[in-house]
From Swiss-Prot:
Pfam families: WDCP. Residues 506-515, 550-565 have a biased composition (Polar residues). This is WD repeat and coiled-coil-containing protein. The gene is wdcp. WD repeats lie at residues 55-98, 154-194. PANTHER family: WD REPEAT AND COILED-COIL-CONTAINING PROTEIN (PTHR14897:SF12). Keywords: Coiled coil, Repeat, WD repeat. Residues 581-609 form a coiled coil. Residues 517-535 have a biased composition (Basic and acidic residues). It comes from Xenopus tropicalis. The keyword Coiled coil applies.
Length: 726
């Protein structure tokens, strides 16, 4: 179902969270309007009915239905804006059953913006939690007043998301990498920190949280990018010891060295415990986290790629889905790696089939996991188009998943987004959940392998099983190992995990990327390897060889291949030549900056006027409009003055042009017989005045005229205009 154009948040949003009401249907927004769409489904294909607009605001970031308490109780709808949340009551008129009556019941505001997933309702009571990055507010009387209380958040970190447990006894707030647990006291109307485990660290930055069954929650953690996106390539990879380095006699090849390790990582936080029990790696996969960083002299040497399994990974090399139980003591019951999704900020759970859907606002894939097995297998992958992003997930039934899809316009990756929201073409899509065991084989490895790694197996049994699988899979084709030790699904094997913004110089060939490896070969060729980052900045005559710059150049360098910069050699040039070269380079940079300002000015005109200025409106050269600028000597106004003719631009003058022409930083212009004004510039650099063609204006140095008046003249006389002024 197509919903049209809409403006939604870029990240951290699940637009279908608490968005379906059994009576009023689906609540959705295009960024301004609140729309209700009828939804009919009885374990069959869902059917969407008519849509009505019940409200319109300046900004709408999210809609959340309150708990369904019966047909006789009016429904509550929370509308999330930028820095406040309004709660509305909806019911049908007693006189006209088809007339919907909407009225506001309460409102809460905060100095900080509301988080993208900033509201969550109690599962069985009219209690609304509103989240900002610093505060957790609880509105417990939303039908009558704005009364609220705030939780005592003792952490200095930033709040990201929160949810109530399914039984409604506990509010779990995600702050950084820790879960803060609060107990709701309905009599005292207060949130109290959990007595036995108020804070539980799970070892990864939390992206999303969703209640599952009873007092259990599902948590997704993001891939820590600081491990793979470091400034120095040596920081981005784990380098093995020197004794493990093997050099091949054939240059240009990569050797694969098989090595398996088995570790059990246990981590405790407060009174809770965290036991990591990850999945097995699929056979014959390559671990790219052990590339040896050779020196520049060893460019012809070979790189060693270690073979490693992640039966019990540390949780620092992948995004994860974690199940946390809050019954008697906090325990992490299950943990699974999420392949191919860096920031899994969308979670949806179905209590009937015990399945979890995981997605990201920045990735076009949706993964479905089953919680019935201790291995938490991936049973289905849903792949959207390249320019489509999931903006919301929810289960209609145990076999139907509703996906809100946002299609983006193709944008230039060289420009980073400047706002937290973006425009999308929105549509609703229903996907059937497949429970076929064969469908889970492509989830990143052998399903039987994953199901075999039950927590009841001993470490020795696991090691024997992995070794046997490895021996059987030696002849199989090799694949690139995704972070977390899980092989990529079929739809991700030939795609990049991270799309990098690269700009290559004319003398540098791009380094081979992960998707260029042929998975049918056991020996992989690398076109070019350079372990030391090259300095791509424009040389200004400084000794920058000692400190290379690894930052990428701007796209403008792509156009300068024909004229590479002249690198200065200190031993061949005199100091005067070096200074001259530096000044020329500085002038070139200033010129480029001036062109950039001009382009920005054109973009501003396009944004304001909706069209590009036409060059056809330019006048012929013989009819060039210009003004004559007379620069008066402040000490001798009656003496000779400098005159320059300057071309007008739409009857406007650039202040910077006059400043550069006469060497003045602060300029005064004569406006009347006894009035001088100091000139300023607007956002585009123009003097905020219009001039006529062939007009003559008089200016002078404002600093000298105001601070040092001429001694031989009367102050009033110094303000008299020159006789040459017309």
């Amino acid at each position: 179902m197509e919903l049209g154009k809409g403006k939604l948040l870029r990240s951290g949003l699940n637009a279908l969270y608490q968005a379906i009401h059994p009576v009023h249907g689906l609540a959705w927004t295009d960024g301004r309007q609140v729309v209700l769409t009828a939804l009919h489904h009885n374990n069959e294909e869902p059917k969407f009915g008519n849509s009505i607009v019940v409200g319109q605001f300046e900004h709408v970031h999210g809609l959340y239905w309150g708990p369904f308490l019966g047909n006789d109780t009016p429904a509550l709808l929370a509308v999330q804006h930028k820095k406040h949340v309004t709660v509305w009551q909806l019911c049908y008129s007693s006189l006209d059953k088809n007339k919907l009556v909407v009225s506001q019941t309460c409102e809460i505001g905060d100095p900080f913006p509301v988080l993208p997933q900033g509201c969550t309702w109690h599962p069985s009571k009219d209690i609304l939690v509103v989240l900002t990055k610093r505060d957790v507010s609880v509105l417990y009387a939303v039908r009558y007043e704005n009364t609220s209380i705030k939780a005592d958040v003792k952490s200095s970190g930033l709040i990201h998301c929160a949810c109530w447990t399914k039984d409604g006894s506990r509010l779990v707030v995600a702050i950084g990498s820790a879960l803060h647990s609060y107990i709701w006291d309905s009599k005292q109307k207060s949130l109290n920190a959990c007595a036995f485990c108020p804070v539980f660290d799970i070892g990864g930055y939390i992206c999303a949280i969703e209640s599952t069954v009873d007092s259990q929650v599902a948590v997704s953690t993001e891939l820590p990018l600081d491990r793979i996106c470091a400034l120095n390539a040596g920081i981005a990879f784990d380098v093995p010891a020197s004794s493990e380095i093997t050099i091949s006699s054939q240059p240009g090849l990569l050797l694969m060295e098989e090595e398996f390790s088995m570790d059990v990582v246990q981590k405790s936080a407060d009174s809770g415990s965290l036991t990591t029990d990850s999945l097995a790696t699929s056979p014959a996969t390559l671990d790219l986290t052990h590339i040896v960083n050779h020196s520049k002299a060893d460019l012809n040497s070979l790189l060693n790629m270690k073979k490693k399994d992640y039966l019990t990974g540390s949780g620092q090399d992948s995004s994860h889905l974690i199940l946390v139980n809050f019954e008697k003591k906090v325990t992490t019951t299950r943990r699974v790696s999420i392949p191919g999704i860096l920031v899994p900020d969308i979670l949806a759970f179905d209590p009937t089939a015990h399945i979890v859907a995981v997605a990201s606002n920045t990735c076009s894939a949706v993964l479905v996991y089953s919680l019935t097995s201790s291995s938490v297998p991936n049973i289905q992958q849903i792949l959207l188009e390249k320019n489509e992003r999931p903006k919301g997930l929810c289960f209609l039934t145990d076999k139907m998943l509703l996906v809100l899809v946002g299609r983006q316009k193709t944008s230039d990756p060289a420009f980073l987004p400047s706002s937290s929201s973006d425009k999308y073409l929105i549509r609703l899509m229903v996907k059937e959940v497949m429970f076929d065991e064969d469908s889970s084989a492509s989830s990143g490895g052998n399903t039987s392998v994953q199901a075999s790694f039950d927590s009841s197996m001993s470490i020795q049994d696991k090691k024997k099983l992995v070794e046997s699988l490895y021996k059987e899979g030696q002849s199989a084709h090799r694949e690139i190992l995704l972070p977390g030790g899980v092989a990529p699904p079929t739809y991700l094997r030939k795609k990049k995990l991270i799309e990098e913004i690269r700009s290559y110089d004319g003398d540098q060939s791009p380094t081979s990327s992960a998707n260029e490896f042929d998975d049918k070969r056991s020996k992989l060729r690398v076109e070019s390897l350079d372990t030391e980052p090259k300095n791509r900045s424009i040389t200004l005559g400084l000794d920058m060889d000692k400190k290379p710059n690894s930052r990428p150049t701007s796209p403008k360098s792509e156009c300068q291949k024909s004229s590479p910069p002249n690198f200065i050699k200190h031993g061949e040039m005199s100091p005067q030549q070096e200074i001259l070269s530096i000044s020329r380079n500085v002038e070139r940079l200033c010129c480029n900056f001036a062109h950039l300002q001009q382009h920005l000015s054109e973009l501003t005109d396009i944004t304001r006027n909706g069209k590009r200025p036409l060059s056809a409106s330019y006048l012929p050269c013989r009819q060039a409009p210009y003004v004559t600028v007379v620069c008066q000597d402040a000490y001798h106004p009656e003496g000779p003055a400098m005159k320059r003719s300057i071309l007008l631009c739409d009857n406007k003058l650039r202040l910077g042009t006059i400043q550069e022409l006469f060497g003045l930083s602060l300029i005064e212009m004569q406006l009347g017989p006894s009035l001088w004004i100091i000139l300023t510039g607007d956002s585009e650099g123009f003097i905020p005045l219009t001039f006529l063609a062939n007009q003559e204006i008089t200016i002078r140095d404002a600093r000298i005229s105001t601070t040092h008046p001429p001694l031989s003249m009367d102050r009033n006389n110094s303000l008299q205009p020159s006789s040459s002024v017309t």
